Amino acid sequence: MLRKLVCGLEIHTQLKTGQKLFSLSSTEASKPNTNISFFDIGLPGSQPTLNQACLLTALKACVSLNSNINSVSTFDRKHYFYPDQPNGYQITQYYRPISSGGFLKLSKRFDEIDEDEKLVRIHHIQIEQDTGKSLYKDLSDKSLVDYNRSNMPLIEVVTEPDLNSVKQVKAFLRKYLQLMKTMDVSTGQLEAGAMRVDVNVSVDDGERVEIKNMTSTSAIVNAIRYEFKRQTKSIDKGNPIKTKETRGWDGNKTFRLRDKESSVDYRYMPDPELPPVVLDVNDIVTRIKKMTITTPEEQLAQLMSPPYNIKLRDARILLNDRNLLGYYYALFSRTSAKNIPSKYPINWCCHEFLGYLAKNNIDFSEDLFPVHQLADLIDCIFREQVTNNNAKILFEHLLANPAENEGPIIDLITKYELGEVDVTNDSELLAQVDSIIDDVLDTYPAIVKELQEGNKPGSINYLLGQCMRTSAGRIKSKVFESRLKEKIHIIK
């Protein structure tokens, strides 16, 4: 019997602001327990003051998620004791959140889901403060607490249980994170704790189980897969899930933490030290919409259409980094002005440039390789002044030795003797080409035989690669390819 996955998300997103939610402490990363105020560590007599920048940033998130902003919202205390919660309560919005309702739409074209469209409803969005961070590593009987994170501004976005597949969950999280980055709501740096997700999983109409505090998409996806299988096996054995519980994820399996708390357990009460937030909703929505830029979906559509014609995967890579996107636009502008096809700038930007950086664990910066230099290098390739292979050699050399990246690219190609050799009317060079090919054919007779018999036609690319390597990439692959085919035919 096919079982149905029913999944809802509670996404805790750290807001991109300079100061904390209810104090003047900086939100910058720093040494433990240095960015703290009296209120952050719960000293008696300290009181909260709402940071207006946090409120505005949260409202931008509400508008971008099509959520209905409430004209009056309030702050409440959620009581529980834990070492990283010095006040003994967390300030959140239980009774009257900043907004209610909303949705995020997924599509087959942009999000690669199976359905043509999928509407994921938002139940509500609330503003709340983060806790401190407990540290247990390498300490057997003690724990440390870093209060730098205490009182950091968060929004909690609670979805309806509308997600029915792992593919939908991945698509939703990717789109949500991209939207928050584009709208400048969050840094989107998952490794720095910018987003933590609680997942509610149930099977068919069974009771839901909550999996707490996951910080990566892979962890979320794997936890959902495991929990779905666990619940399905239990149901198939005649043991339906009847009790709400909270579970953790250890990287391999979910494990029981406790029974799911109810609102009574947290003893919610209005915070007497914080006044209600009263908003002119029409005015604030109008102002925020004027501030917002093109949505990620609109940007994807633009990049995937003429004149850019970028594939979805590459367009997503560009959107993940504003600086990279700006670099690409500048590169495209320079290359298109020289009538160079659109495949060149995206290939060099996303594959050659980012590939080198990933291999060497370097963060992207437009200063690593000036855009005008890369445009000139692409122009030299297009005009057959350098082969693609030798262009890569020069590119990687200049990235590793930036002090040498001065002067015209064509001069650097000449300096390092990387220029493409024209063999068309040079009998001596043509003889050299034939000699290289003969050596390669003699070295790999088995491949030659396969090609002559019509088997594995793609094997010619291997022979071609050997020829290019011998010539140090200075002779066009097309020259070798045509001569190779001729010689293999002659051998026949």
UniProtKB/Swiss-Prot annotation:
Q: Where in the cell is it found?
A: Mitochondrion
**What PROSITE patterns would the database entry show?**
GATB
Q: Which Pfam families match?
A: GatB_N, GatB_Yqey
Q: Does the keyword Nucleotide-binding apply?
A: yes
Q: Which reaction does it catalyse?
A: L-glutamyl-tRNA(Gln) + L-glutamine + ATP + H2O = L-glutaminyl-tRNA(Gln) + L-glutamate + ADP + phosphate + H(+)
Q: Name one GO biological process term.
A: mitochondrial translation
Q: Name one GO cellular component term.
A: glutamyl-tRNA(Gln) amidotransferase complex
Q: What GO molecular-function term can you cite, just one?
A: glutaminyl-tRNA synthase (glutamine-hydrolyzing) activity
Entry keywords, A to Z: ATP-binding, Ligase, Mitochondrion, Nucleotide-binding, Protein biosynthesis
* Known EC number: 6.3.5.-
List the SMART domains.
Answer: GatB_Yqey
**Note from the entry:** This protein may be expected to contain an N-terminal transit peptide but none has been predicted.
Subunit-level organization: Subunit of the heterotrimeric GatFAB amidotransferase (AdT) complex, composed of A, B and F subunits.
| Role this protein plays | Allows the formation of correctly charged Gln-tRNA(Gln) through the transamidation of misacylated Glu-tRNA(Gln) in the mitochondria. The reaction takes place in the presence of glutamine and ATP through an activated gamma-phospho-Glu-tRNA(Gln).
The family annotation for this protein states: Belongs to the GatB/GatE family. GatB subfamily.
Q: What is this protein called?
A: Glutamyl-tRNA(Gln) amidotransferase subunit B, mitochondrial
Q: What organism does the record attribute this protein to?
A: Komagataella phaffii (strain GS115 / ATCC 20864)
